[in-house]
Amino acid sequence: MKDAKDPPPAREGRDTSVHKIDSRHSPHGRDGQTYLASGKSVAMRLWKDEQPNDGDKPASRRDYETVGYVISGRAELHVEGQKVVLNPGDSWVVPAGAEHTYKVLESFTAVEATSPPAQVHGRDE
């Protein structure tokens, strides 16, 4: 009898390798983000100690969905005319194609996941 804790067998030709990413050696994006682990359909990035800004960052639209989680600090997220304040422990979603921008209120650290991966094919530019 198979133990309930045993993982399902790998399918032939399927990549089942695990990848560990050390953020100290990860590439950085032009806006200050650190690119973390990335798979075929989702990628992670870290915004670390982003400093307050006056909110003059222009809004943008991306062809990927973003979900995020606030580790520390505070920011305002503006999406399609709506504003939410993000505090430690909050999470959020920015739908693909939605016009959005962030205004950092206090030194801000957050992790985001994007689907499809933001840094592939110039999506993050």
Predicted regions and their residues:
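Short strand-coil-strand connectors
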Residues: S38-K40, H78-Q82, L105
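N-terminal leader/targeting helix
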Residues: M1-S26
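Short, conserved beta-strand element in jelly-roll/cupin
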Residues: R61-L77
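Short acidic-glycine-tyrosine-enriched beta hairpin
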Residues: G81-A96
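A short glycine-rich, His/Asp/Glu-containing loop-to-beta-strand
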Residues: S23-A59
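Ligand-binding loop in jelly-roll beta-barrel domains
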Residues: A96-H121
